[in-house]
Amino acid sequence: MSSSSWLLLSLVAVTAAQSTIEEQAKTFLDKFNHEAEDLFYQSSLASWNYNTNITEENVQNMNNAGDKWSAFLKEQSTLAQMYPLQEIQNLTVKLQLQALQQNGSSVLSEDKSKRLNTILNTMSTIYSTGKVCNPDNPQECLLLEPGLNEIMANSLDYNERLWAWESWRSEVGKQLRPLYEEYVVLKNEMARANHYEDYGDYWRGDYEVNGVDGYDYSRGQLIEDVEHTFEEIKPLYEHLHAYVRAKLMNAYPSYISPIGCLPAHLLGDMWGRFWTNLYSLTVPFGQKPNIDVTDAMVDQAWDAQRIFKEAEKFFVSVGLPNMTQGFWENSMLTDPGNVQKAVCHPTAWDLGKGDFRILMCTKVTMDDFLTAHHEMGHIQYDMAYAAQPFLLRNGANEGFHEAVGEIMSLSAATPKHLKSIGLLSPDFQEDNETEINFLLKQALTIVGTLPFTYMLEKWRWMVFKGEIPKDQWMKKWWEMKREIVGVVEPVPHDETYCDPASLFHVSNDYSFIRYYTRTLYQFQFQEALCQAAKHEGPLHKCDISNSTEAGQKLFNMLRLGKSEPWTLALENVVGAKNMNVRPLLNYFEPLFTWLKDQNKNSFVGWSTDWSPYADQSIKVRISLKSALGDKAYEWNDNEMYLFRSSVAYAMRQYFLKVKNQMILFGEEDVRVANLKPRISFNFFVTAPKNVSDIIPRTEVEKAIRMSRSRINDAFRLNDNSLEFLGIQPTLGPPNQPPVSIWLIVFGVVMGVIVVGIVILIFTGIRDRKKKNKARSGENPYASIDISKGENNPGFQNTDDVQTSF
């Protein structure tokens, strides 16, 4: 047989083998899809029941259903390894196998997998059921929703906001801290077993595209794109920050620095994530009609059902389908109140088998009106790709899913659209001032959140990578918050806190960079859809409602799900493969120009040195080595506890003996900040159970002086080695010199004067003697002719001469 014949037979054999493997893979995937539908639905339904009714029974049911689903996935993932990806030509088959060959959490041992599930469920429960109680009335307690969120949305009382902000983190964040530490370890172990560097790298894998010529995208490229787009956004954010700071100075005049960061508890919600609720404080032209239509919604008796029906009308107007009957029957759109505990954070659910639902404790506000559009956008995406195989029913990437609803919110928020649905008066006139009002309101929500999102995810990526030691989590968190976001903690937090986990997405294991990428995508999509809708004019005035052309362009992307690379899906809509910040900057260009003019006499940017508690803080320096030499002990958390307890003791003694008040200060009331390894730190004291009541520095100084010897003795130190800066003297009694200082100074001055006089007299006498000696050889007055009446000064009458020095 000729060599060419052998080659032909070999090619046929290889092709046949590939065909056989590919056909086997298809059969395997068909079986998987059928079985997965049922098990996933049961697991999702159990999770829904728990999230809408938090009980021990529902927790157990959810865990059991989740264990079954995890065991099934682990088994199927092992079977999927039998099909080498390099031998699969069909892209749809290959993508499904790629997804299934990722083991996820099932790669962990059974014990660790169960422990991870327990941690996740416990963190979710703590977050959803956490309460903050009034210290003066322990029976009066508030959940996050609606109680604490209501305070953070509407209160203008600095101290009330601080109480809510701090209490939530103290109550919930501290409980979550040990769980979150375990979570990081287990998630990293899972990620590395799946061939990722760490869990942050695993999350970034959602954006990775391989093997598609011209459309590849790496995990590292995501980091680069996020960082360089953030640099482009910063100038706009810095001017928004400066403008908001000036307005907050008007509202809280003694609490804001004109060049400093913004206190974290004053920014509109519990986390400072969205600044939307600052609009009433910052509106540029308050005499214009209010474009926040909350009052109009209340006046017109809108309710949750009406809000979601209006959102549905919007989607239908662009040619997308109605919600299903099951959606309206099974969704939970209002807070169940005291009937049952529920997770109130808005979420969209695709349970499988065509069962789509939304969970949201809707309030009648413009903010929730726009949130309803966002959540229904998720459902539209879910319904559009429902025909895809089970493993490809997802967004092209996580940012795409978040962007879809936001596109609709951009249109729904425009004055044009609000007029069309009767929430703005028909005679509402748009002009330059209403345009700036509108754009500022949009910027408070959209631009204000971008640094928050970027910084939070950057911190988590660094934690997962091991770049931030566990004993420095909070220190680095607030350093990054100051540097990147321009936001400062209103009170210092030590390493017992876990402030990031006080946010739903962190405690519930959501990647967060999706909210950054979605913001860029949404403006790219909006620009493309507005072109399809034949919009003319500025991008911020575009309303795509009633444009079926725009709707069709969007639907063509939605129905692909994850069956095509996201870079290709993006190109199909916007004509470019990568995220681009330019459409967002174009949208806000009129506002940016206006802000630069407003800020021309203000400091733009922020100093990271200022803090709200700095004025009442005392700096401490401790020198163990110089005082104790080789016997010096190690300064650690226990020593800090002793220091704080000692100060608390001093405060109790002072208030009891000087003010006749029994106030039970505890070590938790002594707040420490800026701790340095060479043992220096700042501290201040707050009233027990009231973090907003800072004890004046002068009172703390007096308390320290009163108990100076007890504090010294506790640390085996003295006034020189345990130094309270700014308290002069620090722990010792006032130093009284034996002679008054003014008398010493007077004596020195007089001594200098006397010495000067003596020197002057001596030099004068010496000079006179020299002159007399020089004149002794001749009569200096020989030329005087007395007969002519000339006066001889050598013979003047002494009675007519004034003597002087």
UniProtKB/Swiss-Prot annotation:
Gene3D superfamilies per record: 1.10.1370.30
Essential cofactor(s): Zn(2+); chloride
Residue segments, region Essential for cleavage by TMPRSS11D and TMPRSS2: 697-716
Induction: Up-regulated in failing heart. Expression is induced by IFNA and IFNG. Exposure to cigarette smoke increases expression in lungs. Expression is decreased in nasal and bronchial epithelium of individuals with allergy after allergen challenge. IL13 stimulation decreases expression in nasal and bronchial epithelium.
Membrane-spanning parts: 741-761
Outcome when changing residue 41 to A: Strongly inhibits interaction with SARS-CoV spike glycoprotein
Residue ranges, annotated region (Interaction with SARS-CoV spike glycoprotein): 30-41, 82-84, 353-357
Top-level EC class as recorded in UniProt: hydrolase
Effect of residue 40 to D: Increases slightly the interaction with RBD domain of SARS-CoV-2 spike protein
Outcome, altering residue 324 to P: Increases slightly the interaction with RBD domain of SARS-CoV-2 spike protein
Peptidase M2 domain span: 19-607
Modified sites of kind Phosphoserine: 783
Effect recorded for residue 353 to H/A/D: Abolishes interaction with SARS-CoV spike glycoprotein
Subunit-level organization: Homodimer. Interacts with the catalytically active form of TMPRSS2. Interacts with SLC6A19; this interaction is essential for expression and function of SLC6A19 in intestine. Interacts with ITGA5:ITGB1. Probably interacts (via endocytic sorting signal motif) with AP2M1; the interaction is inhibited by phosphorylation of Tyr-781. Interacts (via PDZ-binding motif) with NHERF1 (via PDZ domains); the interaction may enhance ACE2 membrane residence.
Similarity-based family: Belongs to the peptidase M2 family.
Name the record gives this protein: Angiotensin-converting enzyme 2
Protein source organism: Homo sapiens
Encoding gene, per UniProt annotation: ACE2
